[in-house]
């Protein structure tokens, strides 16, 4: 079993519980170079809001820093950005789906920034 399969297996119980709650889901994906955050509808069929380190606005803010987006500073910017977009779309309450990643480092930085910017989870 490789790392990706193990991570996806760890994500299953969390996603099952979130689907029972019937609330919007803040799902993240972390690669070596970038971090992505999506808010998915309670039905699970549509992405309502998204933010990542690939967006021009985020990249412009990261231009003076080292790295392209694979660090906690970039994750903090993405967390703030996704929270701002969610509030503009009328979403305040979400369930945090860490996608099997440990709640540490970039994942924690993104979650903390989203909470500070006004998302509740």
Curated annotation (Swiss-Prot):
This is Large ribosomal subunit protein uL18. Part of the 50S ribosomal subunit; part of the 5S rRNA/L5/L18/L25 subcomplex. Contacts the 5S and 23S rRNAs. This is one of the proteins that bind and probably mediate the attachment of the 5S RNA into the large ribosomal subunit, where it forms part of the central protuberance. Disulfide bonds: none annotated. Keywords: Ribonucleoprotein, Ribosomal protein, RNA-binding, rRNA-binding. It comes from the Bacteria. The lineage of its organism: Bacteria, Pseudomonadati, Pseudomonadota, Betaproteobacteria, Burkholderiales. It holds the Pfam family Ribosomal_L18p. GO terms for cellular component: cytosolic large ribosomal subunit. The keyword Ribonucleoprotein applies. The keyword rRNA-binding applies. GO terms for molecular function: 5S rRNA binding; structural constituent of ribosome. One of its GO terms (biological process) is translation.
């Amino acid at each position: 079993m490789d790392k990706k399969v193990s991570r996806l297996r760890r994500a299953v119980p969390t996603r099952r519980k979130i689907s029972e709650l019937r609330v919007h889901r803040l799902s993240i994906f972390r690669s070596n170079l970038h971090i992505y955050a999506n808010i998915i509808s309670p039905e699970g069929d549509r992405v309502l809001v998204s933010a990542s380190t690939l967006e021009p606005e985020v990249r412009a803010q990261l231009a003076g820093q080292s790295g392209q987006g694979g660090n906690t500073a970039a994750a903090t910017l993405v967390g703030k950005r996704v929270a701002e977009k969610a509030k503009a779309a009328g979403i305040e309450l979400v369930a945090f789906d860490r996608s099997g990643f440990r709640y540490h480092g970039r994942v924690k930085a993104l979650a903390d920034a989203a909470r500070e910017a006004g998302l509740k989870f």
